[in-house]
Amino acid sequence: MSMEFDAVIIGGGVSGCATFYTLSEYSSLKRVAIVEKCSKLAQISSSAKANSQTIHDGSIETNYTPEKAKKVRLSAYKTRQYALNKGLQNEVIFETQKMAIGVGDEECEFMKKRYESFKEIFVGLEEFDKQKIKELEPNVILGANGIDRHENIVGHGYQKDWSTMNFAKLSENFVEEALKLRPNNQVFLNFKVKKIEKRNDTYAVISEDAEEVYAKFVLVNAGSYALPLAQSMGYGLDLGCLPVAGSFYFVPDLLKGKVYTVQNPKLPFAAVHGDPDAVIKGKTRIGPTALTMPKLERNKCWLKGISLELLKMDLNKDVFKIAFDLMSDKEIRNYVFKNMVFELPIIGKRKFLKDAQKIIPSLSLEDLEYAHGFGEVRPQVLDRTKRKLELGEKKICTHKGITFNMTPSPGATSCLQNALVDSQEIAAYLGESFELERFYKDLSPEELEN
């Protein structure tokens, strides 16, 4: 079996698998490979246990500006449309209601203004008063005594929307479809990349077991591991990484759909939200928390997996200065300490209960169950030159046949949009064609018309 490929994608999560499919379906590349360190695809950040299983289109994510929401909506549409085109309803993609709520006068005023800006972007977006929310999500309004909560509450969202996705199943489908189209493509599992070497006009991707695959172009979609690989080759040396791990709590099946809350604009992390679990029936997930930790990948044991690559990246005065500046802000500092407490046995659950009761006021301590093995690390990029935290996705384009992607949330939602950008770059670099018009026709006709 030949180990030479036009392109090799490092990382078998949903972003890498989406590009594997996009190159196979729409480009003229002959052979593409994925190398993945786990024994199965999508076992880390794209696992159903690692994320909230949400298609983040911007309609209920209150930290998105209208400008960002317009872009994210188009990205989300591609992912949603792919699943519907392939007939993956109730297997990969699920239809539920969803809403964002404001609790208290200040948040209600914010939500009313937000609705006026966002109803033009999202066709069919509905505004919900307290009575309508009670009709749709009774447990958001009813207190433990069966009496309506006293706070003013408004919201907006959809009574029915394809809003939930199992990104691990989606990853598997991308690869299945790609292999049907291009049987000469390859997927290498249990292939943990040790290093990447430039050899004349190709790259050698070398595993810890001394296996080698060769490519004219390498795309690194390796989540938290992308930046260490880039720095090992001399790229991205001006960047650091702040790994933020999210945890969840299970509660009984008390929500009919997704319920999001207003996010503090100072905080780069999602506000607590409630999501009926698409995989574990009868459970609702509340979270995530946000805990910084010295690891590129979460493990059950606190001391297991502390990352030497991360320490090498971050043990410098610029990163310490960024961290000091962040912690100098009282709100951010309190948020960090509060989330550290959430992880503690016994006391953590008591502290988290108050946050969870913002969504379901009748919750009791007995209702909360820490979701062991759920949640994963999201790499937040630190720009050492600008001395600040960079929000969202980060790309290192070398223009030398290798690109590195770091894709925290909503990277899974945007997987096909990111795959489009990467596939066009790869095809152009290799002198191959890419059928952009057909891509838009299949997955985003709105952009074709515009």
From Swiss-Prot:
Q: Which cofactor does it need?
A: FAD
**UniProt-recorded Gene Ontology molecular function terms:** 2-hydroxyglutarate dehydrogenase activity; L-malate dehydrogenase (quinone) activity
Swiss-Prot/TrEMBL keywords: FAD, Flavoprotein, Oxidoreductase, Tricarboxylic acid cycle
Q: Which pathway is this protein assigned to?
A: Carbohydrate metabolism; tricarboxylic acid cycle; oxaloacetate from (S)-malate (quinone route): step 1/1
UniProt KW Oxidoreductase keyword: yes
One GO BP annotation of this record: tricarboxylic acid cycle
Q: Which reaction does it catalyse?
A: (S)-malate + a quinone = a quinol + oxaloacetate
* The keyword Ribosomal protein is annotated on this UniProt entry: no
| GO cellular component terms, A-Z | cytoplasm
Question: What Enzyme Commission number(s) apply to this enzyme?
Answer: 1.1.5.4
Q: Which family does it belong to?
A: Belongs to the MQO family.
Q: What is this protein called?
A: Probable malate:quinone oxidoreductase
- What is the native source organism of this protein? Helicobacter pylori (strain P12)
Gene encoding the protein: mqo
